Amino acid sequence: GLGKKDLKIHLTLIHFTFYKTKMNLNDLSNISDNFKTTQKMPVLFLGHGSPMNAIEENIFVQGFRNISKEIPKPNVIICISAHWFTNGTFVTAMELPKTIHDFGGFPQALFDVQYLAKGNPELARETAELLSPVLVEEDHNWGLDHGAWSVLRHLYPDADIPVIQLSI
């Protein structure tokens, strides 16, 4: 698995790159071209834009599909979503996370979407342990909100990769 130090470095990089600077995705792409290639999977920051992108065919979602063709297929996905508001830090730890439609005022077709990826309780426990001394609690109720599934359904439409979601 991902070492504690590596996970903290990756989370710090995401925070620094996107919240402390004025960088955009093109800037990040230019920087990442200079990173040494390793056997580790890349860390991606992907905003979903309008929730309608989950069901529309446009250049925005084609970009997601292109990304999935350019990186190795992961064994599991840890998604940090800005749509899961919690008091504390939680990780989804269920076998079958539900698809959450946490929005309103959109066409029924968007509410009909189901992204039925499996969860990974073992990875959830490992993630909680790696982030120690931060208390990370296991959650068995949340699921995958649209910040996760609206992007993942374009990256991996077969939903054949286990996904856990982390709230920070």
PLM regions and their residue ranges:
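Short regulatory "switch" loops immediately downstream of catalytic or recognition motifs
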Residues: 1, 23
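A generic structural signal for short, solvent-exposed coil/turn residues
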Residues: 17, 35-37, 158
